[in-house]
UniProtKB/Swiss-Prot annotation:
It comes from Thermosipho melanesiensis (strain DSM 12029 / CIP 104789 / BI429). The lineage of its organism: Bacteria, Thermotogati, Thermotogota, Thermotogae, Thermotogales. Its main location: cytoplasm. Homohexamer. Keywords: ATP-binding, Cytoplasm, Kinase, Nucleotide-binding, Pyrimidine biosynthesis, Transferase. Gene3D superfamilies: Acetylglutamate kinase-like. This is Uridylate kinase. Inhibited by UTP. It catalyses: UMP + ATP = UDP + ADP.
Length: 233
């Protein structure tokens, strides 16, 4: 049983695939899945993307620096939205960030993070890495290491890592486990290069799993055979 996990989710989890904004049904599903693992006393940190609000690659007229900063603020909007919904559903939540000083957001101090976890709070890390040119995958890797997570769980729309796109190839083969070196040798795209490098350097395990299969997150935290586990060796 993992006692401390970092959960990385895309903004699409909040809106639905290909949609924008917030889908209440999706968010209540997220609430229910989180409640299942919090009942076991697992500490949960969350990094959420902002694709439900803004995608920089769709705004070619913007400079990359400005587009990335807008994306960072998008993650702050998502974090505050989740905090309010979570707390209305009896999930104590704190949002921490290095890019915002709004009254509902606290600065990131890692001594405080442990206190939040000890007090039973969910911790949402907003604002990415606080620097442009880095993805929320990289932010998730960084926060997972900093909060001393047992594992980084990447919730996706597919049930793991395949040798090729399972939507295009019926003979695609799913991996149950991989080492970092095997993933690199096979050219598998698990996270962006910077995120993968951080996890590899600090021996952070990564689990890629289907977040939309009910109770999959609980199975993952119980260390059951779910998704694809990427391990140091």
């Amino acid at each position: 049983m993992y006692k401390r996990v970092l959960l990385k989710l895309s903004g699409e989890v909040l809106s639905g695939e290909g949609e924008k904004g917030f889908n209440h049904e999706n968010i209540i599903y997220l609430v229910d899945e989180l409640k299942k693992i919090l009942e076991y006393g697992t500490n949960v940190g969350i990094v959420i993307g902002a694709g439900n609000l803004f995608r920089g690659r769709e705004m070619q007229e913007l400079s990359p620096t400005i587009a990335d900063q807008i994306g960072m603020l998008g993650t702050v909007i998502n974090a505050l939205y989740l905090k309010d919904i979570f707390e209305k559903n009896n999930l104590r939540t704190v949002v921490v960030s290095q890019v915002s000083s709004l009254p509902s957001i606290r600065p990131i101090h890692y001594d405080d993070i442990n206190l939040y976890f000890d007090a039973g709070y969910l911790v949402i890390f907003a604002g990415g890495t606080s620097n442009p040119f880095f993805t929320t995958d990289t932010a998730a890797a960084l926060r997972a290491v900093e909060m001393k997570a047992d594992i980084l769980i990447k919730g996706t729309k597919v049930d793991g890592i395949y040798d090729k796109d399972p939507k295009k190839f019926t003979d695609a083969r799913k991996f149950d486990t991989l080492t970092y070196d095997e993933a690199i040798d096979k050219g598998l795209k698990i996270m962006d290069t910077e995120a993968f490098s951080i996890c590899k350097r600090y021996d952070m395990k990564i689990l890629v799993m289907d977040f939309f299969k009910e109770s999959n997150l609980l199975s993952a935290v119980r260390e059951e055979n779910v998704g694809t586990l990427v391990v140091p060796k």
